[in-house]
């Protein structure tokens, strides 16, 4: 029987969308399909190598759909120069609603819509997005932990687990390290850099090592502060993750049993939503600034060996979202 062909089209705002589609592509391949990823090739190759994900065929295609593109109304223009997707059995986009203009039968993946996640989103663009969703009522895959209510309103929703990696899922009783990271970061990156500069002046800390995202690590730093690699070997040493709560970094941190201490920019609705969801699930502290996140993490460090509640919450998480999504999609042809 001929393999089903699947086109995967990524939003270009950060690495999370590409990573999710890489994991989905790997699962689709393992399930007998033939996936092709449409994304920035260099980003896809970097993520696949770092996260040890099997890389599919990649067509170098940048949708130019970052935050600034959405706010100036140019993001929806990507459909005008999109490649021909008519020959694919299945088309998936994470998380571009405009894919429905090209393939009305397309799947969406993600946990939110851009028109709900950004402040000052252009009114006409939001109106067009909602109109597309109402017209086509697309099928959508979302990790249950992060599903927003809007997805339930406008799509045929299939909820799955987190898109985890089996090579990350390894517990250890000898965790002594902390991670500080902010991803693309937005306006919070400057705050994070100032914090790490001040942190580097401390003579003693509670952790053995503090892994810091390279973009925000000071040049003049002590031996205990080292650049974060985001490789499995790093994550397996992490007890606490002081992070801007993007779904990808949250997933990797949780998969090794780390507790999340979030910080994020006050005007980012997506980060607010993610932080609230993981707090309500008992997986994170209720913090907003990086200073508060650090202080809360130190209190956790002093008592984590007695914190059976956190271990119990971690044990209940489903990390098989990519495999579940692949089977759902292939069974709906």
Model-found features: residue ranges?
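Conserved nucleotide-sugar phosphate-binding/catalytic loop shared by glycosyltransferases and other
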Residues: 3-12, 30-73, 288
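Short amphipathic alpha-helix
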Residues: 18-28, 45
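C-terminal alpha-helical cap of glycosyltransferases
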Residues: 298-305, 315-333
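Donor nucleotide-activated moiety binding/catalytic core segment of transferases
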Residues: 215-255
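Conserved donor-nucleotide binding/catalytic region of nucleotide-linked donor-dependent transferases
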Residues: 285, 290-315
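Membrane-proximal helix-turn-helix segments that form the acceptor-binding/catalytic region
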Residues: 123-140
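Catalytic binding pocket for nucleotide-activated donors in carbohydrate/polymer assembly enzymes
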Residues: 249-296
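Active-site donor-nucleotide binding/catalytic segment of nucleotide-sugar enzymes
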Residues: 7-13, 20, 110-114, 120, ...
